[in-house]
A protein has these predicted regions:
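Short, small/acidic-rich helices and loops at N termini and domain boundaries
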Residues: 1-84
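Glycine-biased, small-residue-rich flexible motifs in mid-sequence functional cores and linkers
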Residues: 3-4, 81-196
Length: 196
């Protein structure tokens, strides 16, 4: 069975905070080892409560199978914390996501100058103009422009970077298959074509 299924199982368990998942990974080494551990072994993990350990009794891999099939159908790549392609800069933050879903070409975050441009959704026309200029200037200078896909400053920075022919990456909080806001559908497609 694919080790990736166990990563998806772990990330899809409801009621576990990401910090709990990371503590379990530090203790056991892999999601597969967590999957097959008994409750007594799980309780030896620092900071794990009995309630949290009981959540790990759910050994259904159905949701993981669904996610794998959907990602394959849509052409999405799945990266785990243990994958060589997982960005080291992201891995070294306090609370790194266990799994990344990637649409497009994963930028070489650790090798490129990556600059995040984020801001308010409810911005003035001046704010939009400045964000587009920032995105354009950064991309023209060779930087990878990273932002959310939210309306306002985030979208403006990405549009500016794309206008400059630069590389972009959008970090989405709502899943790859959900474009929000809907008016950014074309921007979503353009960002995936110019990065991830």
């Amino acid at each position: 069975m694919s080790a990736l299924k166990y990563w998806l199982w772990l990330t899809e368990l409801r009621g576990l905070r990401n910090q709990t998942r990371l503590a379990l990974l530090r203790h056991f080494g892999s999601p597969e080892d967590i999957f097959y551990a008994d409750e007594g072994e799980i309780l030896l993990t620092e900071g794990i409560t009995r309630d949290q350990a009981s959540l790990l009794k759910d050994h259904s891999l159905d949701r993981a199978d669904q996610i794998l099939a959907e990602c394959q159908r849509l052409g999405y790549q799945i990266l785990t914390l243990h994958d060589a392609a997982y960005p080291g800069r992201l891995e070294n933050i306090y609370d790194p996501p266990c799994v990344l879903y990637v649409r497009g070409q994963m930028p070489a975050f650790d090798e490129e100058c990556a600059v995040a441009v984020v801001g308010t959704r409810d911005c003035t026309p001046y704010g939009v103009s400045v964000a587009e200029k920032f995105g354009y200037g950064l991309a023209a200078g060779g930087a990878l422009v990273v932002s959310g896909l939210a309306r306002g400053i985030d979208s403006a920075a990405l549009r500016g970077a794309l206008r400059a022919g630069g590389r972009t990456a959008a970090v989405l909080g709502n899943g790859l298959d959900v474009v929000y806001p809907k008016e950014n559908r074309y921007l979503y497609e353009d960002v995936a074509a110019a990065g991830a």
